[in-house]
A protein has these predicted regions:
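Hot-dog-fold acyl-thioester-processing enzymes
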Residues: 2-63, 110-112, 119-198
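HotDog/MaoC-like acyl-thioester-processing domains
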Residues: 2-11, 67-71, 75-151, 210-212, ...
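Small beta-barrel nucleic-acid-binding modules, principally OB-folds
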Residues: 58-73, 197-209
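Short coil-to-beta-strand transition motifs
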Residues: 78, 155-159, 215
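Structured core of small recognition/catalytic domains
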Residues: 175-246
Length: 246
């Protein structure tokens, strides 16, 4: 039986210029990037990251949902601490919490991610409980807001723009990178809007894969000040996001 002595990755980080937007604060998409990066390093620390799973199980991780609550976005050159840890092992899916804290140990950002594991050849889900992954003694969650189902209809009247997927938008999976979807969704807003409105929370669902050369169509709907953004490849929904501002 595999043993996991340390389930929490705590990393001292620094908000470098690579992580800020035009407000000189950590950007919205860049915040999710830091959460995702810390998760990857946490999995590496536990010996269950994508490299290990590919070699041992011919499998790979897929991150299906992310929800982030923004309390305060840190500024450029601010020192922060990022803590990431798994909170469960629910057979075919797992949830992982991240909290980002300021120098006074006050929370800046709280996040929960949902992930599953797929067989590399047939892309069928595998039981995480049967793999090398923690099964007990999980740390207490710091963020337990439930994921939502987006029951929102949209049509061509909600179309915003389209984007061809280029080579620099794909990653090691040879599919479009998760963060690139978020950046694309955020492009429905002007820079002036994002400067004037501070983000409260967002939730993203990665619904499918898309590849270089495909054309993505972006749709958006504002319902009582809350935005729902959908990205389609032809008739196939590949990404959806909701975002609210304070």
């Amino acid at each position: 039986m595999d043993t996991f002595e340390n389930l929490t990755l705590q990393k001292e980080r620094y908000v470098s210029s690579a992580f800020i937007d035009s407000s000189l604060k950590m950007g919205i998409a860049q915040s999710v990037l830091m959460v995702q990066d810390n998760l990857t390093e946490c999995f590496n620390q536990m010996g269950c990251d994508g490299i290990v799973y590919r070699e041992k199980f011919n499998a790979f991780w897929v991150f299906t949902k992310t929800r982030v609550r923004f309390l305060r976005r840190p500024y450029w050159r601010e020192s922060i601490t990022a803590r990431t840890f798994p909170i469960d092992n629910a057979s075919f899916k797992a949830h992982i919490n991240t909290e980002i804290l300021d120098a006074q140990n006050k929370p800046l950002l709280l996040a929960n991610q949902q992930a599953c594991v797929l067989d590399l050849e047939k892309h069928r889900p595998l039981k995480i409980s049967s793999l090398s992954y923690p099964k007990e003694n999980f740390p207490s969650p710091v963020f337990d807001e439930p994921f939502e189902n987006f029951h929102v209809d949209f049509g061509e009247e909600n179309f915003q723009f389209e984007q061809i997927i280029r080579s620099q938008m794909i990653d090691m999976s040879h599919h479009m990178n998760n963060i690139e979807y978020i950046k694309l969704a955020l492009n429905i807003f002007s820079d002036d809007f994002l400067q004037a409105n501070e983000v409260d929370f967002l939730e993203v669902h990665y619904q499918g894969e898309s590849k270089e050369g495909q054309v993505l169509r972006v749709y958006a709907k504002n319902i009582d000040g809350r935005f729902f953004i959908f990205i389609k490849e032809q008739e196939r929904l590949v990404f959806e996001m909701t975002i609210a501002f304070k």
